Regions:
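Charged, alpha-helix-enriched surfaces in structured cytosolic catalytic cores
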Residues: 65, 83, 102-103
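A common structural junction motif
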Residues: 76-82
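Catalytic NTP-binding/metal-coordinating core of nucleotidyl cyclase/transferase enzymes
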Residues: 1-69, 76
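A short glycine-enriched loop-to-beta-strand structural element that forms part of the catalytic core
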Residues: 82-96
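A residue-level structural signature of the nucleotidyltransferase/glycosyltransferase Rossmann-like core
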Residues: 7, 85, 99-100
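Catalytic-core segments of nucleotide cyclases and related cyclic-nucleotide turnover enzymes
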Residues: 96-105
Length: 105
């Protein structure tokens, strides 16, 4: 299928009610969140392949990069009102058109 890869997925917890309550505030929080995640991805050697809604899909060549990225995001958002869920998955996947596919995903 493809080489073994590591994937990090993120999602902001409770974002829909926040959008309903205050769109301007949520837009600012989301922009901050996106900067934090993208900075952590760059530092950890990952590749963003998905940004649906308020979450990210990021590919890494090894689990060390994915864990480092997740910890970097957590550390940067410690004082932030947003709670971000993150999951890491490892398995075979193939890359096509700047995205990944296969049973792992």
């Amino acid at each position: 299928m493809g080489p073994l890869r590591c994937f990090l997925f993120t999602d902001i917890e409770g974002s829909s009610p926040r959008w309903d309550a205050d769109q301007d505030e949520m837009a600012g929080l989301l922009a901050h969140h996106d900067r934090v995640v993208r900075d952590a991805v760059v530092r950890s050697g990952g590749k963003v392949f998905s940004t649906g809604g308020d979450g990210f899909g990021v590919a890494f060549d090894d689990v060390t990069g994915a864990i480092g990225c997740a910890l970097g995001v957590q550390d940067a958002l410690t004082q932030d009102p947003l709670r971000v869920r993150m999951g890491i998955h490892v398995g075979e996947a193939s890359e096509r058109d700047n995205s990944f596919f296969g049973p792992t995903l």
